[in-house]
C-alpha cells in the first residue's frame, strides 16, 4: 500500500480511558464551595482530554507526551480497588460517582464521545474509523458496518445496538463485559470467542477458523497467553473490513505471547496491528517481519495501557 493510500484511512483513535481521582487534597478550598471546586477540576480534566483528542496517535511530539504524562498522573492517584468499586456498583451509585468526581466523570464523558462518533459519524468509501475504548477495546466502523473487540467498560452494553458483531480474545475481565455480551446475544448478534459457548455455536472456535459477516472477512488462530500456564488461551483476530474500505485489515492480538509459530492463520497484509504492551519487554517484536507467522503492518497502535483495575506497573497500570 503506497503512502497516498495509507493516508486515506481515517483513524479516529479517541482514547476513552477513565481515571479515578482517589485523593481529595485539592478539594479543601472554602472560597468557591464544593460545586465550584468540582467545576474547576472538571474543566481542567476536560482541557486535558481535548488536548489528547486533538493530537494524533501516529505523531509522538512534545505536546502529546506532555498530555499523556498528565493523564498518567491522574491514574497514579487511583487505587485499583476504588476503581473496581465504581465498575461493580449499582448504576445509580456509579452515576453519582461520575457527578462527584471529575476524573470518573472523564471516564464517562470520553465513552459518550466515542458513542456519539459511532452513532453519528459518516465513514467515507475507502476509509475506516477506529476508536480506542479504554484499555484494549476497539471499535471499527466502515461505510457498511461496525464491530467491536475486547470491550471492557462500565457502560459497554450501550454499544450493542450499534455494532454488528463482537470479538473477545480471551476470558479475562479486562477484555470483555458480560452485560455487553448478553445484550449482543439478546439481539441475536454474533459474539466471536474461544470460550463463551460450546463449539456447536458457530462463532466459537478453539483453533484456526474463517468467518464472513456482512462484508467483513475474519481469520482467527489460537495462541498462548503471555502469563505462564495459560496455553491456547488467546484468540488472534485478523479482520478484512471489505472492499468499501479498500480492504482495510485490522489485526488484534489480545494478550498473546507473540510466538510466531502459533500465528498460523494471519492475514497476508495488515494495515493496523493492535499489540498488547508486554511486561516482558519487546517480545511483541517477535511477530514483526516477513517470516512464517509474522506480519509487516502499516501502523502499530500499542494498547493495554493504564489498566486501572490492575495494581502494578508490570500489569500495565
Language-model regions, residue ranges each:
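Bacterial Sec-dependent N-terminal signal peptides
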Residues: 17-39
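Bacterial N-terminal signal peptides
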Residues: 10-18
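Bacterial N-terminal signal peptides that target proteins for export
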Residues: 1-10
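Glycine-rich nucleotide phosphate-binding loop and flanking beta-alpha elements
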Residues: 155, 173-174, 199, 280-281, ...
Amino acid at each position: 500500500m503506497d503512502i497516498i493510500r495509507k493516508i486515506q484511512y481515517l483513524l479516529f483513535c479517541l482514547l476513552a480511558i477513565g481515571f479515578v481521582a482517589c485523593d481529595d487534597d485539592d478539594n479543601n478550598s472554602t472560597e468557591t464551595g464544593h460545586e465550584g471546586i468540582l467545576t474547576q477540576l472538571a474543566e481542567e480534566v476536560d482541557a486535558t482530554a481535548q488536548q489528547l483528542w486533538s493530537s494524533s496517535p501516529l505523531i509522538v511530539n512534545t505536546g502529546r507526551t506532555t498530555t499523556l504524562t498528565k493523564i498518567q498522573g491522574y491514574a497514579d492517584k487511583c487505587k485499583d480497588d476504588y476503581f473496581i468499586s465504581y465498575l461493580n456498583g449499582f448504576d445509580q451509585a456509579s452515576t453519582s460517582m461520575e457527578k462527584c468526581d471529575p476524573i470518573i466523570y472523564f471516564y464517562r464523558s470520553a465513552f459518550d464521545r466515542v458513542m456519539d462518533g459511532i452513532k453519528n459519524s459518516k465513514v467515507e468509501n475507502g476509509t475506516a474509523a477506529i476508536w480506542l475504548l479504554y484499555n484494549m477495546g476497539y471499535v471499527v466502523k466502515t461505510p457498511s458496518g461496525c464491530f467491536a473487540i475486547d470491550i471492557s467498560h462500565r457502560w459497554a452494553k450501550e454499544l450493542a445496538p450499534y455494532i454488528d458483531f463482537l470479538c473477545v480474545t480471551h476470558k479475562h475481565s479486562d477484555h470483555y463485559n458480560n452485560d455487553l455480551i448478553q445484550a449482543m446475544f439478546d439481539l441475536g448478534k454474533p459474539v466471536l470467542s474461544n470460550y463463551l459457548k460450546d463449539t456447536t455455536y458457530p462463532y466459537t472456535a478453539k483453533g484456526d477458523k474463517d468467518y464472513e459477516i456482512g462484508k467483513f472477512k475474519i481469520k482467527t488462530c489460537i495462541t498462548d497467553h503471555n502469563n505462564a500456564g495459560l496455553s491456547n488461551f488467546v484468540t488472534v483476530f485478523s479482520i478484512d473490513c471489505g472492499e468499501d474500505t479498500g480492504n482495510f485489515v485490522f489485526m488484534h492480538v489480545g494478550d498473546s505471547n507473540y510466538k510466531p509459530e502459533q500465528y498460523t492463520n494471519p492475514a497476508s497484509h495488515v494495515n493496523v496491528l493492535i499489540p498488547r504492551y508486554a511486561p516482558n519487554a519487546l517480545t511483541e517484536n517477535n511477530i514483526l517481519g516477513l517470516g512464517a507467522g509474522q506480519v509487516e503492518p502499516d501502523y502499530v497502535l500499542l494498547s493495554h495501557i493504564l489498566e486501572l483495575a490492575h495494581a502494578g506497573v508490570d500489569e500495565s497500570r
